[in-house]
Amino acid sequence: MKKINIAIDGPAGAGKSTISKLLASQLGYIHIDTGAMYRAVGLKVLKNNISPHDRKKIVEILNSTDIQIKLVDGRQLVFLDGEDVTEKIRQPEVSMYASDVSKIREVRERLVKMQQELAKQKGVIMDGRDIGTHVLPNAELKIFLTATAEERAKRRFLELKQKGYDVDYYQLLDEIKKRDQNDMTREFAPLRVAEDAIVIDSTSLSIEEVLQKVLELFYKVVKNEV
């Protein structure tokens, strides 16, 4: 079966990574979570006590920052300056830093180059905010996965609670709304639906139902690509 690239975009907490991982497992594809790369930059900024709005210092620190994505047993690991930060970048305080640094053109340009290199061999499922519109505009299948802000906050709340974090639902809801605003209004590569993307609203759907919809679309595209 011919391999294609799949772009999955959408706002924070829409379930992009969950669906991408399941899809990659079923298809034998490689999953690349681009948000993890921005989180790694956000973590570095946070660790160095730099304001997420200090563009000059962030660009300076970026030049001495080494971010690597490694795939181990089908799982994506993120390394920041040689340290495995796969779990650390999921800390709640890193989220807003990631959103702020992602607005900086120089940060996006550097990470987009990395992302495009990773997708050259095909057979890649890449999720993020600007994959179908900017990173992989020629991806054979583009999905825009969304849900209400309230539903996304609820999912994130349950996920973080399960990991042992002490979080407040209303604070998470506020952060998600702010991230949506940041993502949609940033000057460079904002969050938007690609013209040829298929929109899936997962608000009232289970993970299995969303996965089934995406698989049906995948097989339809692959059939036409032969």
From Swiss-Prot:
Superkingdom, natural source: Bacteria
Stretches that traverse the bilayer: none
Coiled coil: none
Keywords from the UniProt entry: ATP-binding, Cytoplasm, Kinase, Nucleotide-binding, Transferase
Residues reported in the UniProt entry to bind ATP: G10, P11, A12, G13, A14, G15, K16, S17, T18
Primary localisation category: cytoplasm
GO biological process entries: nucleobase-containing small molecule interconversion; pyrimidine nucleotide metabolic process
Catalytic activity: CMP + ATP = CDP + ADP; dCMP + ATP = dCDP + ADP
Compartments in which it is found: Cytoplasm
Entry GO terms, CC: cytosol
Entry EC no(s): 2.7.4.25
GO molecular function, one term: ATP binding
Enzyme class name: transferase
Pfam families for this protein: Cytidylate_kin (PF02224)
NCBIfam families found in the cross-reference section: cmk
Similarity comment text for this entry: Belongs to the cytidylate kinase family. Type 1 subfamily.
UniProt-recorded name of the protein: Cytidylate kinase
Species name: Caldicellulosiruptor bescii (strain ATCC BAA-1888 / DSM 6725 / KCTC 15123 / Z-1320)
